[in-house]
Amino acid sequence: MPEYCLLCHASASGGICRDCLDDLCRSAVAGSQSCPRCGGIGDGISPCGGCQRKPPPFEKLWSSLHYEPPVSGLLHEFKHLRQIALKRLLAELMAALPPPWLHNAGIDGILAVPLSRERLVERGFNQCGELALLLSARYGLPLLPEDTVFRRPAPPQSTLPYARRKKNVAGLFRVAGDVKKRNLLLIDDVATTNATLAELSRMLKQAGAGNLYCWTLAQAKMQKS
């Protein structure tokens, strides 16, 4: 990482200065205004109406930041322009705004949301895996092997309208590793409709996993159109 802030270019270690980090933290996703189950709009205490009607297959979802500039730009450079050195900065942003339940949820392993083999070859790395590796080392939680879950090829969720996203992920994952009774932390980069995390959680539960928790770098808003 450069010895200057990537946002304001002031002298800094780790790619971000304290002032910019504080500014980002002030614009973080407010847990007091979010559903504690799915991360959507809520009162921060009780599950939202949607979760009460149909609880998701994971216990809780937490997003550290909103998917908006400068976070969206940094993530684009990381994923699509292959600026892999940004992984440390992005993991640091997540660690600056961790889930409030992280240390008391009984989590015994971390699993990165996998890419399909084709997408992995195309991109050269799994952005979620890179973040998960750093978070695993930071919190002393074992990272499950990449071949724990396989993902079939499918159009990227970001290219699809809201109505097609749930159908697009149906049957997307196949669990190959032993996850029985494991309480897992799933790491993803962006949560929008939560369809991918919900489908992955559903398949893990079918394979015998215990409680599942989700942590994403950012949360994006999407119109249901």
Name what the model sees in each region:
Residues 1-188, 192-225:
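Glycine-rich phosphate/pyrophosphate-handling loop used in enzymes and phosphotransfer proteins
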